[in-house]
Amino acid sequence: IYVPQPNGQFGDEFYVTTDGGKNWTLLNEKMKMSDGGVEWISTASMHWCSSMAIDPNNTNKVMVVSGNGIFTCDNIWDENPEFYFFSKGIEETVPYDIISIPGGKLVSVIGDYDGFAQDNAEEYGVVHSSVAGSMTGLAVAAKATDTWVKCGGDEEKPGFWYTTDAGKTWNNVKYSPLENNKIAYGGYVGVSADGKRFFWAPGNDSSIY
């Protein structure tokens, strides 16, 4: 169980009524949330919800389509209903880049939730410890496969990150290569085979640095 919606960040509000809509009760201060065995979702909230449905065969059960997957509640009318993550292999994430390292991990960068490092593609991965938001570019050094580079973010939270220990720790490069105090973000990255030189083509510029 983790902290109630909105879990320290933005999230939608949920209401129930038992009198045809004359009165509504806000659930956000009462409900609990569970990651459903998917650890990476435990810092997230239900948000951008596009649809809700009550099970016609079990009116205690509700399913919600969130911006990050599906949440289900089996006890919606209880005093403290519990929503749990119910997406098995269909998380609502957007991969921007995926690299399979020969003999190593499957590494990805995705929208909103940074990305994953997976030892087994059939199992849930571990979110990058940087937790840097939306990442758009990823590269792995061909002869130094513990060295990875990624980029992403926006003007408010730009990001160019690198790791030399296969994602155990990440370093954020604060320097922006652009002139006139313009902040670089997004785009694509590259890394030399030996992992000594990084390349960045920011999404808001036409050059490679």
Where are these regions (language model features)?
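Ligand-binding grooves and catalytic loops that recognize ribose/phosphate and carbohydrate rings
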Residues: 140, 148-157
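Conserved core beta-strand positions within WD40 beta-propeller blades
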Residues: 61, 105, 146-147, 197
